[in-house]
């Protein structure tokens, strides 16, 4: 327990920016859910067991349109397909996490993946507890935001337009932090180039998964050149 608390204290400051973003986005999700006729219990269930922001927002629309369960599953898999790339890149760090592994796989969101690649535990701090703490904290923030939003939304109405930009802003900040911490920026510029080209060719609806696949292939094929 002492080791876990030590790792938890080390991890917490790194998650504050995610707390702010997840609080706002979680509240937006909770409010939208209530506006479509669902209550806080649905918000709690979805945030506990689905825990995928984009999928949860899409699910509101699908459920309201009385879509079949099969359609919901297919759309969810397509929307979250990018997580496969994240999981593959985290295999080495997750392999010794023991009983934590199933939860870490469940809790590997975009933001958690970014933090785990940006920060490492201090000397003397257990890495597996550090990884677990970041994952657990971020999940708690999302659940908390969803619950607050659903409870507040059941009593008040809000205009949530534009709130989705919060997470985009956080990603830009995380990218800049990682950019400043490294001296070799070839990977960063390669990622930007591939993303921009895919966005221009395939549009906002399809570019993300294609860009991620191309980035993984590029890193595999040109690893030595990029590390120089």
PLM features: residue spans?
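Membrane-embedded alpha-helical modules
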Residues: 128-210, 221
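Helix-loop-helix junctions within the multi-pass membrane cores of secondary transporters/permeases
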Residues: 2-3, 74-164
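Residue-level signature of the transmembrane alpha-helical core
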Residues: 16, 23, 44, 48-49, ...
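Residues that define the loop-to-transmembrane-helix transition and helix capping
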Residues: 41, 70, 100, 128-129, ...
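Transmembrane helix boundary and interhelical junction motifs in multipass membrane proteins
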Residues: 24, 28, 41, 52-59, ...
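Alpha-helical transmembrane segments and their membrane-interface exit regions
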Residues: 51-55, 78-85, 170-176, 195-197, ...
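Helix-loop-helix hairpins and the membrane-proximal interhelical loops
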Residues: 1-50, 61-70, 227-228
